[in-house]
Regions:
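Class I S-adenosyl-L-methionine-dependent methyltransferase catalytic core
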Residues: 1-139, 145-200
Length: 200
């Protein structure tokens, strides 16, 4: 069963390259959770990518170069230029279902707290949301530390996430709650619910 009309996917699945932490940190109540875990030992199966790629309102899948054999051909790649040196990669690729040429986002991570070893910047995910204008709900089925949902909260978009790891789930909930308490001044807030009266 596929996603229904209005749903889009913005996600960063496990790449299957063993990038699952290992710094020994484990404190989900506020700080780092980068403890040794086994979430990045295998890629999700091909059926998962077929399901994600068919999202009616569009799909953006980070690490798409690791899944090129599991996804349809695309010209609409997104590229994040990290502006970092050393042993790390210069950038990352996202597969998309959109039409059009490659688009580049140049952004250097700040010293913001990293709670997940492959955590993306909120600014990057906010940029991605601009490529999903028709989406009513954004799904991140590999939610991790919740960056996609934080971006949705800040941009006034509806987001839903799925995360199997309880530590990362707790962190994601905390980060989304914090984003909800610090609304973006340039995004119109959602109207408060109004209780209707019953006419007799």
């Amino acid at each position: 069963m596929g996603l229904t009309k209005g749903w889009a996917v913005l996600t960063d699945p496990p790449y299957g390259i063993g990038q699952d932490g290992g710094r020994g940190h484990r404190k989900s109540s506020g700080a780092r959770v980068q403890a040794k875990k086994d979430w990045d030992r295998e890629r999700p199966p091909a059926e998962v990518f077929a399901w994600l790629a068919a999202a009616p309102a569009g799909a953006i899948i980070w690490g798409g170069n690791y899944f090129a054999d599991l996804l349809p051909p695309t010209m609409g790649w997104l590229y994040w230029q990290k502006l970092i040196g050393g042993d790390f990669s210069d950038g990352e690729l996202a597969w998309t279902s959109r039409k059009g040429a490659l688009k580049e986002f140049t952004y250097r991570k700040t010293n913001a707290e990293m709670v997940h070893p492959t955590q993306k910047p909120v600014a990057l995910m906010e940029w991605c949301l601009g490529f999903l204008p028709d989406a009513k709900t954004i799904l991140d089925p590999f939610m991790g530390s919740g960056t996609t949902l934080v971006a949705c909260q800040r941009m006034g978009r509806h987001g839903t996430g799925i995360e199997l790891d309880p530590d990362y789930f707790d962190v994601a909930c905390r980060r989304v709650d914090e984003a909800a308490r610090q609304p973006d001044l340039f995004v119109a807030p959602e109207p408060a619910p109004v209780q209707g009266g019953l006419e007799l």
